[in-house]
From Swiss-Prot:
Protein name: Hydrogenase maturation factor HypA
GO molecular function: nickel cation binding; zinc ion binding
Positions annotated to bind Zn(2+): 73, 76, 89, 92
Lineage: Bacteria, Pseudomonadati, Pseudomonadota, Gammaproteobacteria, Alteromonadales
Domain of life: Bacteria
Family indicated by similarity: Belongs to the HypA/HybF family.
Organism for this UniProt entry: Shewanella baltica (strain OS195)
GO biological process, alphabetically ordered: protein maturation; protein modification process
Keyword Transmembrane: no
Length: 117
């Protein structure tokens, strides 16, 4: 299950941001997950809940925004937003399309807290 290695890298990235901002705690992690990313949201959530226990993210809530697939047809120049995993243009049925969005997983926002000593 590659979700474990993805979550490990995500938590490491969160820890780096927290350290750079002198934060002691991360309370929320917002990510954008493309439908073509190859990552299963429920497995990602389970992996996050498991890995967060031993670090600065232990109280963090993971919010996953699913990013639909956005394609541009090279034949008819139609830009389409698709919720399913297909690269066929719905306007002209061409396979000559380019993916514009929906393939990545991106860290969008962190909510952090600092102790006031």
């Amino acid at each position: 299950m590659h979700e474990y290695s993805i979550v490990s890298a995500l938590i490491e990235q969160c820890e780096q941001h927290a350290q750079a901002n002198h934060a002691d705690k991360i309370t929320r992690v917002d990510i954008k997950l493309g439908v073509m990313s190859g990552v299963e949201p429920s497995l990602l959530q389970t992996a996050f809940d498991t890995f967060k226990l031993d670090g600065i993210c232990n109280a963090a809530q993971l919010n996953i925004q699913i990013q639909p697939l956005v394609i541009l047809c090279q034949d008819c120049q139609t830009e389409s937003v698709l919720s399913e995993r297909t690269v066929v243009c719905p306007a002209c049925q061409s396979f000559r399309t380019r993916v514009l969005d929906g393939e990545d997983m991106l860290l969008m926002q962190l909510e952090m807290e600092q102790n006031e000593d």
